[in-house]
A protein has these predicted regions:
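Negatively charged
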Residues: 1-283
């Protein structure tokens, strides 16, 4: 069963919040503008498989929890009308949608967006996400963004713009199928929180953090790469901090061979700790 829902001239689309949607397989939503009540748990139904958006979100300030817990949803399709310029929070937006496999959020302009924490938390079958050309100049929080997305293999971060991003705790925590991550388009400052960011991503072979100016002091290595035993390429050439923490970061992670990009001054101090099978590129 499919449902086509339009926004009439004197009506608001928030009436969907009150629909009993258990028998609807596909939901197509058309309209010009959505009001601010169209948000938390709006689609919290066990029946929907696909949602198509043909409307403007400029009336919303949050999409928090919008698709949370949709147990049968497989795909969500956004058109160019999906405007998130006024959205400040997308926390838990797709969390616990355990059969969701595909989401394309490329080319989104989230100029007021500050948090995407837990956005895909426990989306167990999610395979790939396209974040390319995602513009979020005010984004600060991305903690647990993909936590325990066990089937996630690829995330496209090409031209991902988030210059103020600071909190990345457990961002890819136990993403055991993730093959590679290239975050070279993202530049962070030395106070970025990377606690357990890639913890137990044991399938990951390629990791590029070229422009991460992360400072390792005290206990701030925090198992960033713990359990990433299959890495064969890693660029942490902008990392700074105390040498013992650099050593721990590397030695708790690296397998017997691969390629690593490091600062020359770090290499001179820790070269005896790097496995002999590794090729070193110095910058």
């Amino acid at each position: 069963m499919a449902e086509y829902c339009t926004q009439e001239e004197n009506q608001t689309i928030d009436l969907i919040s009150n629909l009993y949607l258990n028998n609807i397989i596909e939901l197509i939503i058309d309209g010009n503008k959505i009001n601010d009540t169209f948000t938390e748990y709006t689609f919290n139904s066990i029946g929907i498989h696909k949602v198509y958006f043909l409307f403007n979100l400029s009336g919303l300030t949050s999409t928090q929890d919008m698709f949370r817990g949709l147990s049968n949803i497989i795909s969500i399709n956004f058109t160019s009308l999906f405007n998130i310029e006024n959205i400040n929070s997308m926390e838990y937006m797709f969390a616990n949608s355990r059969n969701l496999t595909f989401v394309n959020i490329s080319n989104f302009n989230g100029k007021n967006l500050s948090s995407i924490k837990f956005m895909f938390l426990y989306c167990g079958l999610l395979n790939s996400v396209d974040f390319s050309n995602f513009n979020a100049p005010e984004l600060i929080y991305a903690d647990s963004l993909f936590q325990e997305c066990h089937y996630l293999e690829y995330v496209n971060f090409t031209n991902f713009n988030a210059p103020k991003l600071k909190y990345m705790r457990q961002m890819f925590f136990i993403c055991i199928s993730l093959k590679s991550i290239d975050l070279s388009s993202l530049s962070t400052e030395d106070d970025t929180i990377l606690e357990e960011t890639f913890y137990n991503c044991w399938s990951m072979k390629y990791l590029n953090l070229k422009n991460f100016k992360h400072k390792l002091i005290g206990n701030l290595h925090n198992h960033i790469l713990a359990g990433c035993y299959n890495l064969t390429y890693i660029d942490i050439s902008s990392f700074t901090g105390e040498i013992p923490n650099i050593i721990l970061l590397i030695t708790e992670t690296l397998p017997s061979e691969g390629e690593i990009v490091l600062k020359l001054d770090f290499y001179n101090l820790i070269r005896d700790q790097i496995p002999k099978g590794w090729n070193i590129t110095l910058v």
